[in-house]
């Protein structure tokens, strides 16, 4: 493939592109309305808003409607925020009434400004953004209802969230466990617990979770620049995530749970030891004795197959971990890298385990129809042939054209912009590679000529 004539320089937007040596000029005045292109042998490159619609409507595959899912994904509710204004008391009664009227009118105006949708006229479609519950004060069970209305969203929030929402959920989890009637867990006893201070910049992971036989366990505290440090205690494994959503669920006692687990472990160990003793006795009775030529007896010892015991800390998530992760899933299914690191250090898990748990939950919800992944330009059910044809004539889009393509493909503005950016990067790479090949060929030819002259 010959790339000699494909030398594109996309840093400068005034490119010369044509079919066979033609050129298309782009001026700043025609950037918003029309494009004018002139070429000796190239086709006409004038494209307006009407021509874009003709290109889109020309392809039958492009007009095919996207397949609707069985059940649409749940979206977050619109949380209305209201502002309150304080008024100062005056001596006369008339002035106080005026101040009250002014304050009420100001509060109405402020609330109307906050609640008015579509404030930004440039954005045509509103996206579901994961709202962090850091603004709420958790003081009673009624406040927990504000967290139960969160649904699953397919949008990755670009906003920088405060990691304090992780501690809010775990504190709510611990408080509900301490308020449950069937509970013998004392969250205030931290005598036998190790509380580790974790910074967001540290890479050390800890595993504070103890064995099931212990009555208490700890969850480490966070000291980050954006959140205040708070010591957190892990609840008992009898607590269920259903208590967070205010459903009555009967829970078992932690002491009974530990006693049952200890009895089961003791019974299993006794059976295992008895089986080993019986096997050893049988093997000793069935020892084979062989005699050598000298008359010496050689005892052939049997090989005893003993199961290897598990060593190290358990990598499986405990019941507390699953319940806390279930509460974190309700807030966001796309945690940032900083949030994933904090969660892994709090729960004593690795970074990859937390990341894979969120990925598996997204896959599970998508199979059940409760969650749908964000649409990509390549798999949105519409072909990209009109975009490719438009890219051959013009490598850059105006804001108006980008919005029209985004509305036609039902994708975001940034996806169309990134699509053209990626196409330009590919052409840049091909042109640079072609130039490098040409330089290598020229160097080889010069070397051959020099060798022939010397010969």
UniProtKB/Swiss-Prot annotation:
Bias (Acidic residues) ranges: 446-455
UniProt cross-references to PROSITE patterns, sorted A to Z: HOMEOBOX_2
Xref: Pfam families: Homeodomain
Compositional bias segments (type: Low complexity): 1-16, 24-39, 81-118, 179-239, 263-294, 435-445
Subcellular location: Nucleus
Location of the region described as Disordered in the Swiss-Prot/TrEMBL record: 1-53, 67-121, 178-239, 258-296, 431-455
UniProt-listed InterPro entries: Distal-less_Homeobox_TF, HD, Homeodomain-like_sf
DNA-binding region, residues: 310-369, 372-431
Keywords (A to Z) from UniProt: Coiled coil, Developmental protein, DNA-binding, Homeobox, Nucleus, Repeat, Transcription, Transcription regulation
Chain's role: Putative transcription factor.
Name of the featured protein: Homeobox protein 14
Underlying gene: hbx14
């Amino acid at each position: 493939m010959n790339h000699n004539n494909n030398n594109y320089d996309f840093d400068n937007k005034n490119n010369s592109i044509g079919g066979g040596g033609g050129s298309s000029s782009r001026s700043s005045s025609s950037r918003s309305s029309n494009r004018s292109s002139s070429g000796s042998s190239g086709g006409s490159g004038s494209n307006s808003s009407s021509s874009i619609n003709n290109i889109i409507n020309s392809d039958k595959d492009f007009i095919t409607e996207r397949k609707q899912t069985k059940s649409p994904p749940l979206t977050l509710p619109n949380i209305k925020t209201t502002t309150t204004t304080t008024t100062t008391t005056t001596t006369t009664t008339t002035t106080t009434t005026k101040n009250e009227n002014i304050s009420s009118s100001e509060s109405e105006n402020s609330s109307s400004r906050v609640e008015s949708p579509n404030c930004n006229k440039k954005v045509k479609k509103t996206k579901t953004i994961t709202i962090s519950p850091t603004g709420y004060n958790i003081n009673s069970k009624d406040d927990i209802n504000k967290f139960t209305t969160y649904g699953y969203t397919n949008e990755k929030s670009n906003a920088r969230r405060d990691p304090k929402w992780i501690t809010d959920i775990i504190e709510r989890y611990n408080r509900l466990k301490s308020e449950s009637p069937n509970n013998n867990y004392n969250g205030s006893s931290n005598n036998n617990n190790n509380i580790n201070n974790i910074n967001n910049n540290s890479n050390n992971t800890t595993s504070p979770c103890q064995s099931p036989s212990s009555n208490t366990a700890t969850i480490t505290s966070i000291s980050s620049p954006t959140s205040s440090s708070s010591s957190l205690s892990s609840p008992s494994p009898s607590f269920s995530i259903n208590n967070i959503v205010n459903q009555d669920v009967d829970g078992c006692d932690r002491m009974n749970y530990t006693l049952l687990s200890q009895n089961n472990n003791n019974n299993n160990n006794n059976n295992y030891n008895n089986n080993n003793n019986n096997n050893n006795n049988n093997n000793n009775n069935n020892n084979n004795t062989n005699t050598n030529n000298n008359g010496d007896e050689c005892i052939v010892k049997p090989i005893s197959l003993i199961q290897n015991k598990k060593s190290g800390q358990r990598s499986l998530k405990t019941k507390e971990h699953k319940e806390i992760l279930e509460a974190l899933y309700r807030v966001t299914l796309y945690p940032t890298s900083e949030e994933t690191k904090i969660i892994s250090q709090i729960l004593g898990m690795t970074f990859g385990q937390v990341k894979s748990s969120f990925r598996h939950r997204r896959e599970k919800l998508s199979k059940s129809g409760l969650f749908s992944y964000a649409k990509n330009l390549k798999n949105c059910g519409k072909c990209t042939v009109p975009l490719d044809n438009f890219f051959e004539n013009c490598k850059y889009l105006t804001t108006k054209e980008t919005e029209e393509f985004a509305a036609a493909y039902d994708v975001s503005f940034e996806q169309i912009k990134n699509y053209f950016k990626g196409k330009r990067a590919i052409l840049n790479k091909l042109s640079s590679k072609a130039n490098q090949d040409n330089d290598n060929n020229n160097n080889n030819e010069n070397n051959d000529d020099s060798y022939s002259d010397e010969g």
